[in-house]
């Protein structure tokens, strides 16, 4: 059976220097190739929402990105503001420092505060798996399952590494067959996307969506 790669893809542009023209191009590509969503920083949500109005492509906004180390109240506020501006999905970054400090209750409360402000808007929780042990990955995945979030997500693409097959498999095994798993960071070609899907990913975050659906090799510097 042929994989419909486009339906897996969150077409992504999160660079600090991304221009409005580049965001508009991202949205045009997403409409042309029927990607599931575009993923942008919250400041570009109004632009993306306007460009994608009337299309099937959803607008996803990152929150607390890329460090996840801001105040919980600020993350929750940003999520609500992004939704009010037109975001239809939210990708938040956990506070990795808190997790590594053993502040498990604070990490969970941080996620819950954002989830509560998302209401019916799907929330994806970014673990930054390259910085975590397997035990910590399982710990956060179990936390997210308990909080009934929509997805767990591997990476910001801004740290020391991106999605790895073994981490996606571990995340899928932990959350079970229903909850979403998003592989992001360093997924730049069709073969890698297929590996992640076979490992259990139900969404792919990438700046190389066009290359993936066309079977080409993207630039090595992409998200």
Swiss-Prot record:
Keywords: Cytoplasm, Lyase, Schiff base. Belongs to the DeoC/FbaB aldolase family. DeoC type 1 subfamily. Its EC number is 4.1.2.4. It is found in: Cytoplasm. One of its GO terms (molecular function) is deoxyribose-phosphate aldolase activity. Catalyzes a reversible aldol reaction between acetaldehyde and D-glyceraldehyde 3-phosphate to generate 2-deoxy-D-ribose 5-phosphate. The active site is at residues 91, 153, 182. CDD domains: DeoC. This is Deoxyribose-phosphate aldolase 1. Pathway: Carbohydrate degradation; 2-deoxy-D-ribose 1-phosphate degradation; D-glyceraldehyde 3-phosphate and acetaldehyde from 2-deoxy-alpha-D-ribose 1-phosphate: step 2/2. It comes from Yersinia pestis. One of its GO terms (biological process) is carbohydrate catabolic process. GO terms for cellular component: cytoplasm.
